[in-house]
């Protein structure tokens, strides 16, 4: 496996270009009226001391467990702002005592049995992209030790049911590997969270991750057909069903459980044919309330665009998709079966009725060019820009929620204003709080700040 940065996002060889680094420094200097922008050096693993592991590896798990220094560093934190800041500064007070790399469900069961008998906490670990503290190994004093169980060696597609268009897939598979293996069968999952490159199927299920689709199939829930989860008390395995009305759903218990109930080892996942028809357009609005209303009307028209993301003017500007004067609505339709242009035409009619301005793109791959393409590229690169900013002393973080349409506009405007006031009070500096809608529903929206 490729070596990951223990102090930031991605692999060790994934660094910003020199020009990207300089661009970030120029922006920081301009925004904060600085003559010079200093950077904290990238930490070296060998210079960081860790407390000694509190347990020894049993002989029957010697091929599964390791106490390697770099592995313990890599599995101490997720990728939130506090996580990256502490990693860059070399602060690792509570690393895992051991790291497990199971290659089968049997090895997961054996590790959990040993841990349960010896009062050792086990934290499931996928790609380590968590920003909510889910993989942090500080568990307090109730356990003798901590194991971080990295699932990435369980990374195979075990079975494909083409007739039902579903596949049985191990939980440790990373997003790119999943799509590459499905591509051989002309199938796709098309679940693309921002962490796609460095997150796993099991992680998506455990966190109920939101993905590529802004409407309809918005979260991993919509693709999960069944799950298999190993717990200290046994295995929970749900049945493959297209739908069920028979009482509480065991999958609903596992999806979003954040690893507290057990280790997800595999899942049957609903798939799709690879899209061949695409229709896209970017719409600009001068008035945010009108832009929000256009987004609502499109969401309630049963058109179900794959992408229906509204960026406020500053969010668009920071992502290279505008100059800060207009709000931007990115609309994209896709299908493996039929031309989507009529759906796009209707969505644009709705947007125009609310003051939206647009020019129909001439390029075949319009979703990869122009304002839409700029935002797409910035979206993927954003975590790398953030870690570079953190090394230069910038506090940069995000938060999100969901709310019904009747409260949406007032909520967004009030939250942005109050966040700016709070930051001003604490730092005595002006700041910018931006917003984009990640998902939209007939009855509400999901703003991301």
Residue ranges and their predicted role:
Residues 1-113, 131-165, 313-322, 370-398, ...:
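N-terminal flexible segment immediately upstream of the FAD-binding catalytic core
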Residues 14-18, 47-51, 98-101, 168, ...:
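Hydrophobic alpha-helical scaffolding
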Residues 63-87, 273, 279, 284, ...:
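C-terminal substrate-recognition/cap domain of FAD-linked oxidoreductases
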Residues 131-135, 142, 146-150, 260-265, ...:
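Short, acidic (Asp/Glu-rich) active-site segment that either coordinates a divalent metal cofactor
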Residues 155-309:
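FAD-binding subdomain of flavoenzyme oxidoreductases
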